[in-house]
Amino acid sequence: MIKAGIIGGAGYTAGELIRLLLNHPETEIVFINSSSNAGNRITDVHEGLYGETDLRFTDQLPLDAIDVLFFCTAHGDTKKFMESHNVPEDLKIIDLSMDYRIKSDDHDFIYGLPELNRRATCTAKHVANPGCFATCIQLGLLPLAKNLMLTGDVSVNAITGSTGAGVKPGATSHFSWRNNNISIYKAFDHQHVPEIKQSLKQLQNSFDSEIDFIPYRGDFPRGIFATLVVKTKVALEEIVRMYEEYYAKDSFVHIVDKNIDLKQVVNTNKCLIHLEKHGDKLLIISCIDNLLKGASGQAVHNMNLMFNLEETVGLRLKPSAF
């Protein structure tokens, strides 16, 4: 059994990660660290886990007792932890924050998008889990980059559910504001753009165009629905072939020949992609569950690869809407 520890156990991504690991046939949770909830039952915070666990939060860190450590912490906290603690040399780490997503000589974290860096992830000791928007958008663009087709700016509009804002309440997460409402935020300046560009340039070194990304807040709890537009004269049939070929060995990305919707992916680790041509414009529709394929599900996917397990173990999930 893979023995796992979690630091930062009170948020939405942590709750989903706990649920996945509790039901993972090859994993045992040793501890869930949360200084603000130490001593409390996990179900005091994650009430959807009633009947599934008797675990309690702890402020202890028995790092020598685990094989893999997940960070579900606020941005900046993982880096502080790594700099201030003696982490066992052979301990595998999966960081769900954005601290190590950008390549640097200062760290050895692999960018953990399996559809891009599968081979590197399989041998990695430290993995940086991608952002939710970044995952959805990259999966819509990677086959084009692989075929050197990103020669102009990319237009992206993507809407996310309220869980994307985290568990702490804010002015834009209250039900009375969010319900029956929509708004944009961080237009052209979202923090996930640099990691998207980094990945595209990894496949297409000549890529130097803009990602014109406008994020939207949706009035639903979870999921990301993105539309991407690029210009190309290549026929749709050839583009579909490129996408199917690129994702042929990936278990969670599926090219769908009819229009898609968010309910098809919520509560799964899938990404569905639909392609259309309108004149010289290619429309790419990509959708994921922000908490699973965009966070905790992808983290478990990375764990499976790091421990040489079949990649779908513990992740064969049914959409919650059907």
Swiss-Prot record:
GO MF, one annotated term: NAD binding
Any single biological process term in GO: L-arginine biosynthetic process
Family to which the UniProt record says this protein belongs: Belongs to the NAGSA dehydrogenase family. Type 1 subfamily.
Entry protein name: N-acetyl-gamma-glutamyl-phosphate reductase
Keyword Endoplasmic reticulum: no
Superkingdom per UniProt: Bacteria
Alphabetized InterPro entries for the sequence: AGPR_AS, AGPR_type-1, NAD(P)-bd_dom_sf, NAGSA_dehydrogenase, Semialdehyde_DH_NAD-bd
Principal location listed in the UniProt entry: cytoplasm
Enzyme class: oxidoreductase
Function: Catalyzes the NADPH-dependent reduction of N-acetyl-5-glutamyl phosphate to yield N-acetyl-L-glutamate 5-semialdehyde.
Metabolic or biological pathway, per its Swiss-Prot or TrEMBL entry: Amino-acid biosynthesis; L-arginine biosynthesis; N(2)-acetyl-L-ornithine from L-glutamate: step 3/4
Localisation per UniProt entry: Cytoplasm
Lineage: Bacteria, Pseudomonadati, Bacteroidota, Bacteroidia, Bacteroidales
Entry keywords, A to Z: Amino-acid biosynthesis, Arginine biosynthesis, Cytoplasm, NADP, Oxidoreductase
Catalyzed chemical reaction(s): N-acetyl-L-glutamate 5-semialdehyde + phosphate + NADP(+) = N-acetyl-L-glutamyl 5-phosphate + NADPH + H(+)
GO CC annotation, single: cytoplasm
One protein family per Pfam: Semialdhyde_dhC_1
Active site positions, chain numbering: C132
Gene: argC
NCBIfam families: argC (TIGR01850)
EC assignment: 1.2.1.38
